[in-house]
């Protein structure tokens, strides 16, 4: 019978359809640790702003934006099109869901899973991440 299976031609067509037109922009004074992956943008660029520290084994998906003075620690996953605003600290092994914004001056606790956009100046932790308290100063 003729079941559904990818063929060489279908693979080529899909590859052509999914070609990325975006790139990756990395600012000044950025540190990127070993075994870190930063995907280029699909339509828009993936942007890493100035003065950002990205530790080892971090995965940054397509179209993500990381603003200035941010620390992303070991094992963090930023799913596609997520945004980390300025002056944030993302705890080890945390995950930020796609299309979610971590607003400025936020601290995300270790192994947290952020499923919804945060408010400014917050401390969040847990799975799913919940607002803990106001973070007046990082």
Name each model feature, range by range.
Residues 1-125, 129-132:
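Structural signal for interior beta-strand "rungs" in well-ordered beta-sheet cores
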């Amino acid at each position: 019978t003729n079941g559904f299976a990818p063929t060489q031609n279908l693979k080529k067509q899909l590859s052509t359809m999914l070609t990325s037109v975006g790139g990756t922009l990395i600012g000044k004074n950025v540190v990127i640790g070993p075994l870190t992956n930063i995907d280029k943008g699909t339509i828009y660029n993936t942007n890493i702003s100035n003065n950002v520290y990205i530790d080892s084994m971090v995965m940054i998906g397509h179209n993500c934006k990381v603003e200035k003075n941010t620390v992303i620690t070991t094992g963090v996953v930023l799913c596609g099109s997520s945004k980390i605003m300025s002056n944030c600290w993302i705890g080890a092994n945390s995950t930020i869901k796609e299309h979610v914004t971590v607003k400025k001056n936020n601290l995300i606790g270790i192994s947290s899973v952020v499923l919804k956009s945060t408010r400014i100046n917050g401390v969040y932790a847990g799975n799913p991440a919940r607002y803990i308290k106001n973070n007046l100063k990082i």
